[in-house]
Amino acid sequence: MAEAFAGTWNLKDSKNFDEYMKALGVGFATRQVGGMTKPTTIIEVAGDTVTLKTQSTFKNTEISFKLGAEFDETTADDRKVKSLITIDGGKMVHVQKWDGKETTLVREVSGNALELTLTLGDVVSTRSYVKAE
């Protein structure tokens, strides 16, 4: 099921991302850079291991994980979190927990588009990606 997410995805549109970063506790300067950055996300699937790479002029991150198995992750804004990623109803659901907080990142593919919905409390941000040729 994770194979549906495999590919190279380029950010084309972002809504409410600054508010989401603010809710995470990201500082002003980092939010300014993060808001202007147009990252590329590369998702690779090899057997039961999924690798998710995010590349931008600001920062590159890479995580490898098995669906349904909790793992330690250091986020692009340097939070140390416990992450769990599952496939639920055709969506890739990524839950990050740290310091009594929780955020959910949901990826959904439709054709050559990937929609990422970021939720923290009542703050919701959507980031739209298009698959690279």
Curated annotation (Swiss-Prot):
Binding site for octadecanoate: R127, S128, Y129
CDD domains to which the protein is assigned, alphabetical: FABP3
Domain of life: Eukaryota
Residues at which (9Z)-octadecenoate binds: R127, S128, Y129
Residue positions where N-acetylalanine is found in the record: A2
Positions of hexadecanoate binding: R127, S128, Y129
Xref: PROSITE patterns: FABP (PS00214)
Modified residues (Phosphotyrosine): Y20
Keywords, comma-separated and alphabetical: Acetylation, Cytoplasm, Lipid-binding, Phosphoprotein, Transport
Pfam assignment, any one: Lipocalin
GO CC term, one of those recorded: cytoplasm
Family recorded in the similarity comment: Belongs to the calycin superfamily. Fatty-acid binding protein (FABP) family.
Domain-level remarks: Forms a beta-barrel structure that accommodates the hydrophobic ligand in its interior.
Function of the molecule: FABPs are thought to play a role in the intracellular transport of long-chain fatty acids and their acyl-CoA esters.
Protein name in UniProt: Fatty acid-binding protein, heart
Native source species: Oncorhynchus mykiss
Annotated gene: fabp3
